[in-house]
A protein has these predicted regions:
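C-terminal motif of bacterial Sec signal peptides marking the signal peptidase cleavage site
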Residues: 17-20
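Bacterial N-terminal signal peptides that target proteins for export
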Residues: 1-9
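Secondary-structure boundary elements
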Residues: 218-274
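Low-complexity, Gly/Ser/Thr/Pro-rich intrinsically disordered linker/tail segments
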Residues: 81-87, 97, 127-143, 334-369
Length: 369
């Protein structure tokens, strides 16, 4: 009995102690961890941080090219007076840059100090639609300018712009390049457009944006129909020619001349020459270029003057040498001419086409080279 009483007392004491354990979880504890910088402090990885005026202008130009209407720039360890530089940079963007002259109406800003750095909220108002600004081409060389124009022709753009990092090119130079691109894309240009070029450079001249307008006389659907007809006509005309032979370029010239027997005085295209059968020197040269392209014969349309009058002709490769060939001056006999032979009556920009140094010669159908 005595042992049972002692066991009962011990059991009761144990139960009381276990009940007291619940109060342990009601106590407060201190948790420690390393200090972290607030997330709104500027870091070196933050791409919006601006440290000098040059960086500020780069950021503004980038945002304008992306058609950003409102954005925030953060100034970290800035070298200069932020308020003064912001005012100057916004004015320079609007009046002193090509992108500003092309499409920016106004630029405004507000600043706010945020802990360890300054933020500027920039607002840009544009005077052109977003689609025009975002589709500005960028070019560095004459070849890249031509590539941009060809892309615009292929897409049937009537208005487009090219940004060029140069101070030497003027509107007449760019218009000539656009014209050359049109002449040498006979499959695309089936209605020769009028060309208008406007330059935008602001008060600076390190960069220029050239706005180009092409005005056609037929609709987009008509252009597509003409391209299809011309493609079929070229395939028909070249089907009887054998590619790779020395005489093939000369035979191709006769094919073009026979397909276009009527001469007109208005500016024409390969479509006019090969589908309608009538063309001036422009149309004949473009038609020959179209046929040579189909046969993989190196050929180019040259724009120049003949006895003081605007004229187009071709420079074509025959047996490894280049020659001038003016189809508007030929009959059944072809006169392949050198640069020296042409200079007396023709004028052209020498570096616009390959050099023709080989001796001139006359070719008649059926002859072997």
């Amino acid at each position: 009995m005595h042992k049972r009483c002692i066991a009962g007392i011990l059991l009761a004491a144990l139960l009381v102690s276990l009940c007291g354990c619940t109060s342990v979880f009601d106590k407060e504890y201190l948790s420690e961890r390393p200090y972290e910088e607030p997330s709104n402090l500027l870091t070196d990885a933050d791409t919006t941080q601006i440290r000098n005026y040059a960086g500020l202008m780069r950021a503004l130009n980038t945002m304008a090219a992306q058609y950003e209407r409102s954005f925030v720039l953060a100034f970290g360890d800035y070298d200069g007076i932020i308020a003064d530089d912001l005012a100057a940079a916004c004015e320079e963007l609007r009046t002193g840059t090509a992108i500003g002259a092309y499409c920016i109406e106004s630029v405004s800003y507000e600043t706010e100090q945020v802990i360890a750095y300054c933020e500027a909220s920039i607002t840009i108002t544009y005077n052109r639609p977003e689609s025009e600004v975002r589709s500005i081409y960028s070019a560095q060389t004459q070849k890249s300018i031509l590539d941009c124009v060809v892309d615009a022709l292929d897409r049937q753009k009537t208005q487009f712009a090219i940004q060029i990092s140069t101070s030497t090119l003027e509107t007449d130079d760019v218009a000539a390049l656009v014209r050359s691109a049109c002449l040498n894309q006979p499959q695309l240009v089936v209605d020769f457009p009028s060309i208008d070029v406007t330059v935008y450079s602001g008060s600076g001249n390190s960069q220029k944006i050239f706005g180009i307008t092409l005005q056609y006389s037929v609709s987009e659907s008509a252009v597509n129909d003409r391209r299809t007809q011309l493609d079929g006509r070229v395939r028909t005309l070249t089907s009887a020619l054998t590619t790779g032979e020395q005489e093939t370029p000369l035979q191709a010239a006769l094919v073009v001349m026979r397909a276009c027997e009527q001469r007109i005085s208005t500016v024409s295209t390969a479509y006019d020459a090969l589908v309608n059968g009538s063309a001036d020197s422009y149309g004949l040269a473009m038609a020959y270029k179209a046929v040579c392209d189909a046969l993989n014969i190196p050929c180019q349309v040259v724009s120049g003057r003949f006895q003081g009058i605007d004229r187009c002709w071709n420079v074509v490769q025959i047996d490894g040498n280049y020659y001038h060939l003016d189809l508007s001056m030929q009959s059944e006999t072809l006169w392949l001419r050198s640069d020296e032979s042409m200079r007396g009556t023709y004028q052209w920009t020498a570096d616009s086409c390959p050099t023709c140094a080989a001796q001139s010669f006359i070719w008649r159908e059926g002859e072997k080279l």
